[in-house]
Amino acid sequence: MSNALPLDEWVETARQCKYLPENDLKKLCERVKELLLEESNVQPVRSPVTICGDIHGQFYDLLELFKTGGEVPDTNYVFMGDFVDRGYYSLETFTYLLALKARYPDKITLLRGNHESRQITQVYGFYDECQQKYGNVNAWKYCTSVFDFLTLAAIIDGKVLCVHGGLSPKVRTLDQIRIISRNLEIPHEGPFCDLMWSDPEDIEQWQPSPRGAGWLFGSKVTAEFEHINGLNLICRAHQLVQEGYRYMFDNSLVTVWSAPNYCYRCGNVASILSLNENLDRDFKIFQAVQEERNIPTRPTMQYFF
């Protein structure tokens, strides 16, 4: 079945910010789930690679990201989740990333973020967008079924860990991430939840998170986790950074944010992080695209998550 799918055609359609016929989207989602089923919770990735943070449905800025970092398959990518919600083109954004994954499975790794959740997408826009564009919720159901298959983390050359949110007090080793049951809705607490929701903070240990999910984690627990697991860098997303990226903990952790002018009003720049074969770090900064297009008249949501 997979060999007969018109993947190049779907990639080209999605690149034009068009969504697929409902039945084609269903087939695409099924194909990507087959691929994701083979991936580990901590998916190994080889350098060189480019690491990306939140996209949040900002389709035209995703095109700018690829213009900045290189097109798939010329560049190998890890996306650290939050593909949908808040932006006007969550459906087209996720469809494009799925089409690229189906066509070039070894050149793009898609991690789960806290917004890859049925509950969150019913509040922050993706559910309503699918309903509006397709006239029913089937597309949302197909896409959210893919969410449950997305992997939780990526490890680059055994040295750089990519995860959407951060660490968990219940996770000391990568092996403990590898045995998490991931094929389900994100739980409200526990290690799976923490990987999606936690944030670094200028503390040493752990504090409850003001988000109401996950934890604030500090420099000491980060250093311990990296030492135990032989890591030299943790890359994560999940927090808006005005400058596009922010280092913490003696440059051993970095937040990468890839949605410029977030929610079309925050005024921030975006970044992607390119690692070469020696894992040398090169941040590429890009700005929101300035172009005339008809913006749908749907209000953006306030920034709570």
Swiss-Prot record:
What are this entry's molecular-function GO terms?
A: metal ion binding; protein serine/threonine phosphatase activity
Please provide, in alphabetical order, the Gene Ontology terms of the cellular component aspect for this entry.
Answer: cytoplasm
One GO biological process this protein is involved in is: G1/S transition of mitotic cell cycle
Q: Which cofactor does it need?
A: Mn(2+)
Q: Which gene encodes it?
A: ppp6c
> What is the official name of this protein in its record?
Serine/threonine-protein phosphatase 6 catalytic subunit
Catalytic residues, chain numbering: H115
Family note? Belongs to the PPP phosphatase family. PP-6 (PP-V) subfamily.
Task: Enumerate the residues binding Mn(2+) 1.
Answer: D54, H56, D82
Query: Which reaction is the catalytic activity of this chain?
Result: O-phospho-L-seryl-[protein] + H2O = L-seryl-[protein] + phosphate; O-phospho-L-threonyl-[protein] + H2O = L-threonyl-[protein] + phosphate
InterPro entries (UniProt xref): Calcineurin-like_PHP_ApaH (IPR004843), Metallo-depent_PP-like (IPR029052), PPA2-like (IPR047129), Ser/Thr-sp_prot-phosphatase (IPR006186)
Keywords assigned by UniProt? Hydrolase, Manganese, Metal-binding, Protein phosphatase
Annotated binding of Mn(2+) 2, by residue = D82, N114, H164, H238
EC number(s) recorded for this UniProt protein:
3.1.3.16
Checking PROSITE patterns in the record gives: SER_THR_PHOSPHATASE
Pfam families, from UniProt?
Metallophos
According to the record, how does the cofactor bind?
Answer: Binds 2 manganese ions per subunit.
